[in-house]
Curated annotation (Swiss-Prot):
<dbReference type="InterPro" id="IPR027417">
    <property type="entry name" value="P-loop_NTPase"/>
</dbReference>
<protein>
    <recommendedName>
        <fullName>Protein translocase subunit SecA</fullName>
        <ecNumber>7.4.2.8</ecNumber>
    </recommendedName>
</protein>
<dbReference type="Pfam" id="PF21090">
    <property type="entry name" value="P-loop_SecA"/>
</dbReference>
<feature type="binding site">
    <location>
        <position position="832"/>
    </location>
    <ligand>
        <name>Zn(2+)</name>
    </ligand>
</feature>
<comment type="subunit">
    <text>Monomer and homodimer. Part of the essential Sec protein translocation apparatus which comprises SecA, SecYEG and auxiliary proteins SecDF. Other proteins may also be involved.</text>
</comment>
<keyword id="KW-0067">ATP-binding</keyword>
<dbReference type="Pfam" id="PF02810">
    <property type="entry name" value="SEC-C"/>
</dbReference>
<dbReference type="InterPro" id="IPR036670">
    <property type="entry name" value="SecA_X-link_sf"/>
</dbReference>
<dbReference type="InterPro" id="IPR044722">
    <property type="entry name" value="SecA_SF2_C"/>
</dbReference>
<dbReference type="GO" id="GO:0043952">
    <property type="term" value="P:protein transport by the Sec complex"/>
</dbReference>
<keyword id="KW-0479">Metal-binding</keyword>
<dbReference type="InterPro" id="IPR014018">
    <property type="entry name" value="SecA_motor_DEAD"/>
</dbReference>
<dbReference type="InterPro" id="IPR011116">
    <property type="entry name" value="SecA_Wing/Scaffold"/>
</dbReference>
<keyword id="KW-0813">Transport</keyword>
<keyword id="KW-0811">Translocation</keyword>
<keyword id="KW-1278">Translocase</keyword>
<feature type="binding site">
    <location>
        <position position="834"/>
    </location>
    <ligand>
        <name>Zn(2+)</name>
    </ligand>
</feature>
Length: 849
């Protein structure tokens, strides 16, 4: 262990030497930059951009660019970065974590790498923990960037998409982590490219990086919405509709457990829901409810697939064990459809449209870096998850803060009384005190005790960031007493007031140890900034959460031996501090394992999400006709369906293929069982399924071509194709996210059966993803073939041209150009030239044949 520590320390020393060497190069430009006029210094930005375009790397530009920022900061802000700040800036440019103590000027440090990386023109995101800090830093540092010729944007949650787009198009964008994440998710839900707000993610510099990438790592960003009461009503309406159907209105394929409406069922649906065409693009969601209602009523069997509990809940029956599966629900809306069928309450659902964890969000940046005062304890996690090293930057002046050993009491009451006595003693001599708590309840309790003791004070609970920043700024004034939860006021320095140095500086009192050493170090770091004197003292009790969970019996026995009756007895020793830190390390290890497991699950979704989002982006940005892609989907759907049925009994297989063709490809009377037998050269022993695939593909191609002809322009065709694909993809993807959530909950229990839940999740989610792709292609096929396509005429705004793939317009014996049609050379199995979509023998050739 000692060897490992020695190696880490030596590595850090070696890294510091390299940083100092580069920092000296930056400093060597100081006189040259100081000699430049304002105009000459400002012109350097354009010069750097040109040199970058001509092939110089950012690393090569670094010494001179950093020197320009230093000189600019001196002229605009009245601040001149120290060498240690230059070193911190170099670490940030290299994509690592710079650990810089509180008060060492992290905000100014960031200006150098931000400026350098903005030169590329690809955008820099400066990420803060709240919007107040985003606005503050963008305003303060924005003066410098603007003076140097760079644009600065602030991305706030209250801004409109147009304002957000403008902010993201700036050279430098200030934002919170959550807002960048939500904008990314929303960008991947739009239908048109012009509605996207972000550019490709280039370089992110994260302030308080441990808070964002470690503490928030398990928190997923979710774009969702409660399913409205109207949606729940749709389950009931769809259920009421399918219960009116007869066996002639739908076709069931028993082996594959699929079901769909035939022509008479479609007609009834259009009448029931008052629609012109069920398979219009606008009705994609409705067809989903109808499909689920059909499955619920005619495929899912009560007491076999599910049971209704005495509490009126639908419980899934495990097909292998026969046991009910508590807590599991059928995905894709099927569970709600069964609830509607059985007349039990339809449980409200929240539909997740998109989600991502901070871990995977920030790993998408080309380069990621961060600043914090406390990152070394999480070095392994930064390296393993984000491929970032943690480099401790030396302080500009030696730290003079005195960190006292912990004080341990037997009860919470005794501990808090001791805290109040200590605060009172320091208040009376004028020394400012900052009391750190881990919970709002503790803050309120101590506040009440201080009121009773007659000690005026301020309370911060991390609710109003702007107000609290002003309070925390004054926490170093003579006689100030401030209570703060650990995160309250973070990002704002506490500067000492007049006469406070002589009183010992700011005293930080911790009312209990946090489960993370890093959070304790953050609290300590509020005191002793830039070489100022200060003190820190932690008060503990055996009733604290950490001590109850991990406190050793040895500590308890020592207290008992000292005086079991005196609760005010106190232990103060190095042994106690070591025991507490040992407990913290165990908790940190557990938390890291949990975050790592979250990432393993999310990595599976990440791979799938990237595929879907990339395909989606390709569709949105396509300037081409998407016919090849759609026809490929149709062909794969045909091949997949025919292959699936070919494994069944011959008669069943042909009927299944016929039902599919009628439901998804062509009008019902455009194909018959005899046609399939004829094309498939059916004998008692064989069927030529490949020939059937070719035949169905030709039929589908003809229907597709007729559908597209109903659109008048290339622009209209592309718009229709894009909307069709995106609506189906988004619908299926949101269902898939829900299904993955349910799968994750389910596989967690398999660990008890000696199965690796992660491996099970990876395997099953891959199969589900393949199924989703198949479902997307099927829905695109069906909607394309069956949609009633409208286009508003530009010349006659009020005239609406409406045609349908099922040929429900009156057919005249003339083509679209008014020319008479010659039927004499049309074969019986050819499509009728009138454009109805039916075979000639079933349309204008009916009398003849």
């Amino acid at each position: 262990m000692a060897n490992i520590l020695r190696k880490i320390i030596e590595n850090d020393k070696g890294e510091i030497k390299k940083l100092e060497k580069t920092a000296k190069k930056v400093e060597s430009y100081a006189d040259a930059m100081a000699a430049l006029s304002d105009e000459e210094l400002q012109a350097k930005t354009e010069e750097f951009k040109q040199r970058y375009q001509n092939g110089e790397s950012l690393d090569q530009l670094l010494p001179e660019a950093f020197a320009v920022v230093r000189e600019g900061a001196k002229r605009v802000l009245g601040l001149f970065p120290y060498r240690v700040q230059i070193m911190g800036g170099i670490v940030l440019h290299h994509g690592d974590v710079a650990e810089m103590r509180t008060g060492e000027g992290k905000t100014l440090t960031a200006t150098m790498p931000v400026y350098l990386n903005a030169i590329s023109g690809e955008g820099v995101h400066v990420i803060t923990v709240n919007e107040y800090l985003s606005e503050r830093d963008a305003t303060e540092m924005g003066e410098l960037y603007s003076w140097l010729g760079l644009s600065v944007g602030i991305n706030l949650s209250s801004k409109s998409p147009a304002e957000k787009r403008e902010a993201y198009n700036c050279d430098i964008t200030y934002s919170t982590s959550s807002e960048v994440g939500f904008d990314y998710l929303r960008d991947n839900m739009v239908v048109r490219k012009e509605n996207m707000v972000q550019r490709p993610l280039n370089f992110a510099l994260v302030d308080e990086v441990d808070s964002v990438l470690i503490d928030e790592a398990r928190t997923p960003l979710i774009v969702s919405g409660p399913v409205s009461s109207e949606t729940n009503q749709l389950y009931h309406r769809a259920d009421a509709f399918v219960k009116t159907l007869t066996e002639d209105d739908y076709a069931i394929d028993i082996p594959t457990k699929t079901i769909g409406l035939n022509d008479s069922g479609i007609d009834k649906a259009e009448e029931f829901f008052n629609l012109e065409n069920l398979y219009d693009i606008d009705n994609v969601a409705l067809t989903h409810y109808i499909d689920n209602a059909l499955r619920a009523n005619y495929i899912m069997l009560r007491d076999i697939d599910y049971v209704v509990s005495p509490e009126q809940e639908i419980l899934i029956v495990d097909q292998f064990t026969g046991r009910t599966m508590e807590g599991r629900r059928f995905s894709d809306g099927l569970h709600q459809a069964i609830e509607a069928k059985e007349g039990v309450p339809v449980q409200e659902e929240t539909k997740t449209s998109a989600s991502i964890t901070y871990q995977n969000m920030f790993r998408m940046y080309k380069k990621l870096s961060g600043m914090t005062g406390t990152g070394k304890t999480e070095e392994d996690e930064f390296r393993e998850i984000y491929n970032m090293r943690v480099i401790p930057i030396p302080t500009n002046r030696p730290i003079q803060r005195i960190d006292h050993d912990d004080l341990l009491y037997s009860t919470l009451d005794a501990k808090f009384r001791a805290v109040v006595q200590d605060v009172k003693r320091r208040y009376e001599k004028g020394q400012p005190v900052l009391i750190g708590t881990v919970a709002v309840e503790t803050s309120d309790l101590i506040s009440k005790m201080l009121v009773d003791a007659g000690i005026p004070h301020e309370v911060l609970n991390a609710k109003n960031h702007e107000k609290e920043a002003h309070i925390i700024m004054n926490a170093g004034q003579r006689g100030a007493v401030t209570i703060a939860t650990n995160m309250a006021g973070r990002g704002t320095d506490i500067k000492l007031g007049e006469g406070v140095l002589e009183l010992g500086g700011l005293c930080v009192i911790g009312t209990e140890r946090h489960e993370s050493r890093r959070i304790d170090n953050q609290l300590r770091g509020r005191s002793g900034r830039q070489g100022d004197p200060g003190e820190s003292q932690f008060y503990l009790s055996l009733e604290d959460e950490l001590m109850r969970r991990f406190g050793s019996d040895r500590i308890k026995h020592v207290l008992e031996r000292l005086n079991a009756d005196d609760e005010d007895i106190v232990i103060k020793s190095r042994m106690l501090t070591r025991q507490v830190e040992s407990a913290q390390k165990r908790v940190e290890g557990n938390n890291y394992d949990t975050r790592k497991q979250v990432l393993q699950y999310d990595d599976v979704m990440r791979e799938q999400r990237e595929i879907i989002y990339a395909e989606r982006y390709d569709v949105i940005t396509a300037e081409r006709d998407l016919e090849p892609e759609i026809k490929a989907m149709i062909k794969r759907t045909i091949n997949r369906t025919v292959d699936g049925h070919s494994r069944n009994d011959q008669e069943e297989a042909l009927k299944g293929i016929l039902n599919f063709a009628r439901q998804a490809l062509v009008p019902e009377d455009a194909i018959s069982l005899e046609d399939l037998k004829e094309v498939g050269e059916v004998t008692k022993r064989s069927v030529n399924y490949d020939a059937i695939k070719v035949y169905l593909t030709e039929l589908a191609d003809n229907v597709y071509d007729r559908q597209i002809k109903k659109l008048r322009s290339e622009e209209a065709i592309r718009e229709f194709q894009k909307v069709l694909i995106l609506m189906v993809v988004d619908n299926k993807w949101t269902d898939h996210i829900d299904a993955l959530d349910q799968l994750r909950n389910a596989v967690g229990m398999r660990g008890y059966a000696q199965n690796n839940p992660i491996v099970e999740y990876q395997s099953e989610s891959f199969k589900m993803f393949q199924d989703m792709i198949g479902a997307i292609e099927y829905d695109v096929t069906r909607t394309m073939m069956k949609a009633q396509i409208h286009e508003q005429s530009r010349e006659h705004v009020n005239e609406r041209v409406s045609t349908t793939a099922t040929g429900n317009i009156q057919a005249h014996q003339a083509d679209a150009n008014g020319q008479e049609i010659d039927f004499s050379k049309v074969g019986r199995n050819d499509f009728c030239p009138c454009g109805s979509g039916k075979k000639f023998k079933n349309c204008h050739g009916r009398k003849q044949f």
